[in-house]
């Protein structure tokens, strides 16, 4: 099933109710099998209709749609309300792979990828990007992730496939992405084609008309978001598909532009989720050489690496690890085996070393 099954997710209460209700209902039916409670046929019909109505109302009011959260996040993403995705996930956790992909994307969009990644259950590559997407939502979110990490051509391809596979080859949301990608790559005639299509739709007309001035190459080059995307365009030929070979495709992007923050964060997030600390430390050495600041998540992983994988005090001291992070890690090492699991999770559940020690490593796709 595409819906999450993860050690950190509690078993839903509804499953327990179903298991308890089945023997109870069977016992009641056996007990009343030969009894007659209502003799008039008219009353029998009324009672049956009332019970049917109650069942229908209960089904409508208390149903749990497994895709509800994913569609909610898809709606927020369409409006660009990324903070609402993060806030909802904090309040209700995450119940679906597509929802988790949107959540991780929202963390990247809001600049909280490194600070909040370990606050939510991670399931591996399937939580970062859909694998070989075919559905409308899969293609949309794959295009969103590719756009975020700077692989513009991949974002364009996913959007184009989504448009072709939609009814009457019309999918305004993906057409907007096609306009954006064509503007970034300087294919102005292709961009104008989709601008014309969107201008014929009253709902998207204003947005499409606002893009028309960007069909001029000079105006386009001076637009901030386009300049930012062009600055991160791949330099070397990158034939790898993000949805099939995610870490390798990201490595190409990082090698081309070390300052591509979203691609770097996704790449480091992938390595940490799969507990590949050796490869992770290769990138940490490069960060150290560039004199960059280390997020707390990376500091925690570095502490774990030098404590459990390669004990080298001198090398450890060469990294800018804050005293607070070191003290918390030492406290964790001291109480990890003696503290009750619930208390340990409450105190250290948002740290990388807790994840590495107690959460099973996802299987690679």
Regions found by a protein language model. Name each.
Residues 31-43, 156, 162, 187:
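Extended alpha-helical scaffold regions
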Residues 276-323:
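Intrinsically disordered, low-complexity segments enriched in Gly and acidic/Ser/Thr residues
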Residues 40-65:
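Internal/C-terminal transmembrane anchor helices
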Residues 1-37:
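Membrane-embedded alpha-helical segments of integral membrane proteins
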Residues 252-253, 312-365:
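Terminal, low-structured helical/coil segments at or just beyond the last alpha-helical repeat
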Residues 15, 44-51, 158, 194:
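Alpha-helical transmembrane segments
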Residues 27, 36-49, 110-118:
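Short, charge-rich, low-complexity alpha-helical interaction segments
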Residues 59-240, 247, 255-274:
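Soluble catalytic regions of membrane-associated enzymes that act on cell-envelope
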